[in-house]
UniProtKB/Swiss-Prot annotation:
Family annotation (Gene3D superfamilies): Urease, gamma-like subunit
Matching InterPro entries: Urease_gamma, Urease_gamma/gamma-beta_su, Urease_gamma_sf, Urease_subunit
Identification of the protein by name: Urease subunit gamma
HAMAP family, per the entry: Urease_gamma (MF_00739)
Family, similarity comment: Belongs to the urease gamma subunit family.
Protein localization: Cytoplasm
Quaternary structure note: Heterotrimer of UreA (gamma), UreB (beta) and UreC (alpha) subunits. Three heterotrimers associate to form the active enzyme.
Known catalytic reactions: urea + 2 H2O + H(+) = hydrogencarbonate + 2 NH4(+)
Enzyme class: hydrolase
The species this protein was found in: Mycolicibacterium gilvum (strain PYR-GCK)
Encoding gene, per UniProt annotation: ureA
Length: 100
């Protein structure tokens, strides 16, 4: 199987999000990279499902809560920005304060 660098990046991100979800299911609090991976995966998959940028900007704030992450992680995440592929092209999705 031959993957472009872009496809390799998406695959790695998807795996990182899956690993973070397994850790979360075991009751572990997520660190910064794990939280970003889950939020980013939510946005990429939402775009693939046909959701709008506006919908993802809102729903991206509901993916994780303060109880899901280690102390200090919400303060480290002011914004999460993801270039996602929508049916009508690639767009930048910004989720402000993704962990309220």
């Amino acid at each position: 199987m031959r993957l472009t660098p872009h496809e390799q990046e998406r695959l790695l991100l998807s795996y990182a999000a899956e690993l973070a979800r397994r850790r979360q299911a075991r009751g572990l609090k997520l660190n910064h990279p794990e939280a970003v991976a889950i939020i980013t995966d939510h946005i990429l998959e939402g775009a693939r499902d046909g959701r709008t940028v506006a919908e993802l900007m809102i729903s991206g704030r509901d993916v994780l809560g303060r109880d899901d992450v280690l102390v200090g992680v919400p303060e480290m995440l002011d914004d999460v920005q993801v270039e996602a592929t929508f049916p009508d092209g690639t767009k930048l999705v910004t989720v402000h304060h993704p962990i309220p």
